[in-house]
């Protein structure tokens, strides 16, 4: 494919000249984090699933253009099991450590979007007044580019055991990935 040609271009030169490709996996990772089996195959997070010789896929579960995993966990997450209701903040946050385990440890570079490692749960369509307004809502426009509330600083998210656990779990996985051959 054309992507393979770009990624593998002059791969044996030092430095190699190949192009890094984006590996959007938002829907698949969100299905996993929400507790659903459908459309949850994360195989394409790795470069080898694309047929690339080098680690040329910048895989990610979240970005500036995609809805936050935590927002969808709390809004649409599996809630049929009362002892593991993903719409519960503590349960939803616990699932983010698992997202790190099955994304960060895949060989190749990864992108972590702002505060995903602390379980940011506000929609990307959150307005300055705290409401959520997407381009699909009855009111014209959306708030995707609005200034977002910043509770992580005033509420000391690193002092919150549930959020700090995600941060520390992800840090351990990144350290493992960078110090051990995976």
Describe these PLM feature segments.
Residues 76:
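Gly/Pro-rich active-site loop or hairpin
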Residues 68-71:
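Short, solvent-exposed loop/turn elements at domain surfaces
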Residues 1-61, 66, 79-83, 91-110, ...:
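Active-site-proximal helices and loops of the catalytic beta/alpha 8
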């Amino acid at each position: 494919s054309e992507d393979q040609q770009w990624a593998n271009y002059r791969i044996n030169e030092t430095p190699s000249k190949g192009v890094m490709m984006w590996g959007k996996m938002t829907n698949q990772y969100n299905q996993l984090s929400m507790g659903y089996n459908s459309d949850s195959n994360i195989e394409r997070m790795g470069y080898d699933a694309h047929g690339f010789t080098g680690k040329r896929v910048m895989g990610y579960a979240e970005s500036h253009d995609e809805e936050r995993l935590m927002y969808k966990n709390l809004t649409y997450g599996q809630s049929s099991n009362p002892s593991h209701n993903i719409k519960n903040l503590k349960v939803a946050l616990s699932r983010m450590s698992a997202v790190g385990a099955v994304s960060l440890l895949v060989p190749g570079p990864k992108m972590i979007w702002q505060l995903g490692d602390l379980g940011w749960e506000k929609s990307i369509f959150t307005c300055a007044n705290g409401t959520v307004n997407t381009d699909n809502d009855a009111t014209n426009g959306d708030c995707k580019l609005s200034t977002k509330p910043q509770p992580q600083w005033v509420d000391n998210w690193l002092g919150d055991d549930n959020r700090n656990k995600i941060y520390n779990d992800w840090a351990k996985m990144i350290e493992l990935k960078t110090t051990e051959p995976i």
